[in-house]
Amino acid sequence: MPDNEGQHSVARRDGGWKRVVLKLSGEAFAGEEQLGISPKVVGYIAQAIAEAVAKGIQVAVVIGGGNMFRGAELSQGGMERSRADYMGMLGTVINCLALQDFLERLGIETRVQTAIHMSQVAEAYIPRRAIRHLEKGRVVIFGAGLGAPFFSTDTAAAQRALEIGAQAVLKGTQVDGVYDSDPRKNPAAVRFDRLDYNEVLTRGLKVMDATAVSLCMDNGLPIVVFDLMGKGNILRAVQGEKIGTIVCPPDV
């Protein structure tokens, strides 16, 4: 396994990231629909990832399953929470396979690794194998969250990033950064260019859930929040350009 010392420094010497985890919401995959998968959206995401790989950036992806199932919402409707969460995990795998298909159509070797064993469609999650795939220029897509209920795919993204030695978690959202309130409801909302983890937690800002933010804070792992569907934004984010909001240690 490679030496991971200094793996979470904000940028490498040439100003970009070398290895990143791209966190995508399941809702994004649905496009303008509330459920299902939009080929147009997945194709756009795959093309952007392919461009990043062509530039030598190692890209791993974690996808939510909200376009299929949301465990927390199902449990509110009376379903047992653990079972609902497992349904959500299976939904993430559907999204992973869709993205894999679009990437491979573009000639990008892709591996799906899941936290729940399903050997007919994906590899089991093995960190050292994931790192080796990335070093070979393959995209690795992590599915089924952490394989345990009560943990979000945000937390899975943070944990996977730490374990494979990624330099940042890049979270693609429907807005262009982190605001002090919802900009879709409040035209006067103020966007932050930079935040530290404690500020995110104490103010309850919508970056990631508290568990994921705390995990990143404890390990100095930067989080970049950006507008997923903005033209060229995925490539800009993975190249380490200034975009959206960065959450990082205050002294970096």
UniProtKB/Swiss-Prot annotation:
**GO MF terms on file?**
ATP binding; UMP kinase activity
EC number(s) given by UniProt: 2.7.4.22
* Reaction equation(s) it catalyzes: UMP + ATP = UDP + ADP
Q: Which Cys pairs are S-S linked?
A: none
Enzyme class, top EC level, equals transferase
Subunit note: Homohexamer.
Give the protein's biological function. Answer: Catalyzes the reversible phosphorylation of UMP to UDP.
Q: What species is given as this protein's source?
A: Thermobifida fusca (strain YX)
SUPFAM superfamilies assigned: Carbamate kinase-like
**InterPro entries attached here?**
AceGlu_kinase-like_sf (IPR036393), Asp/Glu/Uridylate_kinase (IPR001048), Uridylate_kinase (IPR011817), Uridylate_kinase_bac (IPR015963)
HAMAP family assigned to the protein according to its UniProt record, in alphabetical order: PyrH_B
Official protein name in the record: Uridylate kinase
One GO cellular component term of this record is:
cytoplasm
Q: Which family does it belong to?
A: Belongs to the UMP kinase family.
Pathway the protein acts in? Pyrimidine metabolism; CTP biosynthesis via de novo pathway; UDP from UMP (UMPK route): step 1/1
Give the activity regulation note.
Answer: Inhibited by UTP.
The UniProt annotation places ATP binding at K23, L24, S25, G26, G66, R70, T173, Q174, Y179, D182
Chief location: cytoplasm
- Tell me where in or outside the cell this protein is found: Cytoplasm
Residues the record lists as binding UMP: G65, D85, L146, G147, A148, P149, F150, F151, S152, T153
A Gene Ontology annotation in the biological process aspect, one of them, is: UDP biosynthetic process
**Keywords of the record:** ATP-binding, Cytoplasm, Kinase, Nucleotide-binding, Pyrimidine biosynthesis, Transferase
